[in-house]
């Protein structure tokens, strides 16, 4: 039966390479492709679409994690908690616009004191008119 299928034990088997590693990504391209196909977003899904989507998701995740890590470090913490993610997202103009309608669980609120509630400035900034 020579010539049919693979022969046992001859030669080295080629190691499978994932589409994520080919694209240099950490996010799973194959899983995203499966979700796109199962979700019935379109009748057909191109080969580059899941790669592009995985790259975009990875970039957004890295951006949020970097800003949240900075917020955690500013608060002298070594662990990122939802509060740090909330502070990171709301302090960044573009991320705040993108995630404007998103509620982050246990994120708290942004610290804000209305200007009318702040104490009045009573400094000698203007010279008085009583010297005349």
UniProtKB/Swiss-Prot annotation:
Major subcellular location class: nucleus
Gene Ontology MF annotations: DNA binding; protein heterodimerization activity; structural constituent of chromatin
Organs and tissues of expression: Low level of expression; mainly in roots. Found in the root cap cells and in non dividing tissues of the plant, including the root elongation and maturation zones and the leaf veins.
Superkingdom classification of source: Eukaryota
Record keywords, A-Z: Chromosome, DNA-binding, Nucleosome core, Nucleus
CDD domains: HFD_H2A (cd00074)
Entries under InterPro entries matching the protein: Histone-fold (IPR009072), Histone_H2A (IPR002119), Histone_H2A/H2B/H3 (IPR007125), Histone_H2A_C (IPR032454), Histone_H2A_CS (IPR032458)
Protein's cellular compartments: Nucleus; Chromosome
Record GO cellular component, one term: nucleolus
Post-translational events: Not ubiquitinated.
Database matches in SUPFAM superfamilies: Histone-fold
Transmembrane segments: none
Region (Disordered): 1-22
DNA-binding among keywords: yes
Family: Belongs to the histone H2A family.
Function per UniProt: Core component of nucleosome. Nucleosomes wrap and compact DNA into chromatin, limiting DNA accessibility to the cellular machineries which require DNA as a template. Histones thereby play a central role in transcription regulation, DNA repair, DNA replication and chromosomal stability. DNA accessibility is regulated via a complex set of post-translational modifications of histones, also called histone code, and nucleosome remodeling.
Subunit: The nucleosome is a histone octamer containing two molecules each of H2A, H2B, H3 and H4 assembled in one H3-H4 heterotetramer and two H2A-H2B heterodimers. The octamer wraps approximately 147 bp of DNA.
This protein's name: Probable histone H2A.1
Organism: Arabidopsis thaliana
């Amino acid at each position: 039966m020579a010539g049919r299928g693979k022969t046992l034990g001859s030669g080295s088997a080629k190691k499978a390479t994932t589409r994520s590693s080919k694209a240099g990504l950490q996010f799973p391209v194959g899983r995203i492709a499966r979700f796109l196909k199962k979700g019935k977003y379109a009748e057909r899904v191109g080969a580059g679409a899941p790669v592009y989507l995985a790259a975009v998701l990875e970039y957004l995740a890295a951006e949020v994690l970097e800003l949240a890590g900075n917020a955690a470090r500013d608060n002298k913490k070594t662990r990122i908690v939802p509060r740090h993610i909330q502070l990171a997202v709301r302090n960044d103009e573009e991320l705040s616009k993108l995630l404007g309608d998103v509620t982050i669980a246990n994120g708290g609120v942004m610290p804000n004191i209305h200007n009318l509630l702040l104490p009045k400035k009573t400094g000698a900034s203007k010279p008085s008119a009583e010297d005349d």
